[in-house]
């Protein structure tokens, strides 16, 4: 089953999602859906996001569940700069995990 999580739903007046703390409730909802066996579509409609926000939203999932978690996520209505941030965060956290395994 697929679940969509809209980043606009809780912060309609804010255009740029920037604080780590503001990403935590979305990440918890994503984790809940993943634990239920669902794939998750993260909808960025009308939103920009900072690296800190994306790291808390996606990077924390990669650190906790491993890089394979990305196969259960998809990103919708995502601006190009946010796509670049997502790719960077995923690669950075996957590298961090692999270095931990070597150490």
Go through the PLM ranges and name each one:
Residues 55-57:
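A structural signal for leucine-rich repeat
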Residues 1-48, 59-103:
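STAS-like cytosolic regulatory interaction modules
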């Amino acid at each position: 089953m697929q679940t969509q999580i809209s980043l606009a739903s809780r912060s309609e007046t804010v255009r740029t999602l920037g604080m780590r703390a503001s990403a935590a409730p979305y990440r918890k909802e994503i984790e809940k859906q993943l634990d239920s066996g669902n794939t998750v579509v993260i909808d960025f409609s009308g939103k920009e996001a900072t690296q800190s926000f994306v790291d808390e939203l996606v990077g924390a999932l990669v650190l906790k569940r491993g890089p394979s978690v990305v196969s259960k996520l998809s990103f919708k209505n995502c601006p190009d700069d946010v796509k670049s941030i997502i790719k960077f965060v995923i690669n950075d956290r996957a590298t961090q995990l692999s270095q931990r395994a070597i150490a």
